[in-house]
């Protein structure tokens, strides 16, 4: 779904099998449980993605609380995309991005206060991620403990940035834009950029 489109990303019940595949470089955003597909963080990162030569898409998960249904919706949406795929997720959207990354052969994942290792969510198997990852989390997050991002970063050798912020990270959007830009640039560099 492109910015400004009010329809759900792709409804598997009504998806047209004859739709064309879009080839290129794609960033696909997954929003959190309490937000929408064009919330403040996502909207602020769209221009960064476009400036680095990516098409920006945001999947609408409103009304889907089950993370397995969200993963299925993301997989269905990404069937229409070919080429480089970068997944970006915030909160529950971060969980969805991680759970989908290997299946979708993502080139990288960028996670903001991801809901990892949370009670009530299906457990992710260790080592589930096979691409570069960067995590951004707020020290004062009272929804998802920042320690969960530390654990994930340690396990997956991912970059981690802990910022003076809370769960929504709104006071750090400019910093997150810079971190996201660096992440996208580094994906085009030799492997040393993530080691």
Question: Where on the chain are the PLM-derived regions?
Answer:
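A conserved short beta-strand
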Residues: 105-117
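Short, surface-exposed "cap/lid" segments of acyl-processing enzymes
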Residues: 2-64
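Post-His helix in hydrolase/transferase enzymes
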Residues: 170-186
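Gly/Ala-rich beta-loop-alpha elbow adjacent to hydrolase catalytic centers
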Residues: 88-97
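Short alpha-helix in the alpha/beta-hydrolase fold that links the catalytic acid
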Residues: 42, 145-153
